[in-house]
């Protein structure tokens, strides 16, 4: 529950309005809401992307998740899990694993979005992982 409003509407009537939290991702085994708030773990089985953050910076992780989701939608990839380390970020998608250094993460994702469909045509087999840590291209498995 994010908020509760209680109003007295008639001499003996109370109006209670409950505003629920909206879960966005699983963050280090807890729930991250759509506004970036981290709340306690849920016993319910939720089908949400997972963020494993070894830097323990929930706000930065939320920003990384939003950026990644926005860019990967352009190439029809869904995020299953993101692992954020001090120097690298690993994104596990519905189809493959993406690896990037943190410093150039946004630039690397943008390069991938521009070239992804060409890579799929060039490699006529399934691409398991794309390492974007190289400034002049990608390492593809």
PLM region spans:
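Extracytoplasmic segments of membrane-associated envelope/inner-membrane machinery
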Residues: 14-98
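Extracytoplasmic/luminal low-complexity segments enriched in Pro/Gly and acidic/polar residues
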Residues: 103-141
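Membrane-embedded segments
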Residues: 2-20
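Short secondary-structure junctions
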Residues: 2, 70-78, 120-125
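Residue-level signal for well-ordered alpha-helical segments
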Residues: 1, 9, 59-61, 68, ...
């Amino acid at each position: 529950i994010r908020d509760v409003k209680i109003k007295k509407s008639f001499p003996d009537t109370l109006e209670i309005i409950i505003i629920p939290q909206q879960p966005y991702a699983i963050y280090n085994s807890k729930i991250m809401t759509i506004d970036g708030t981290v709340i306690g773990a849920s016993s319910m089985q939720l089908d949400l992307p997972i963020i494993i953050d070894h830097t323990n910076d929930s706000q930065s992780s939320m920003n990384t998740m939003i950026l990644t989701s926005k860019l990967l939608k352009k190439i029809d990839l869904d995020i299953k899990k993101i692992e954020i380390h001090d120097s690298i970020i690993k994104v596990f998608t519905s189809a493959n694993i993406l690896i990037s250094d943190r410093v150039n993460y946004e630039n690397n994702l943008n390069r991938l979005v521009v070239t992804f469909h060409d890579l799929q045509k060039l490699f006529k087999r399934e691409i398991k992982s794309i390492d974007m840590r190289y400034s002049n291209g990608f390492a593809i498995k």
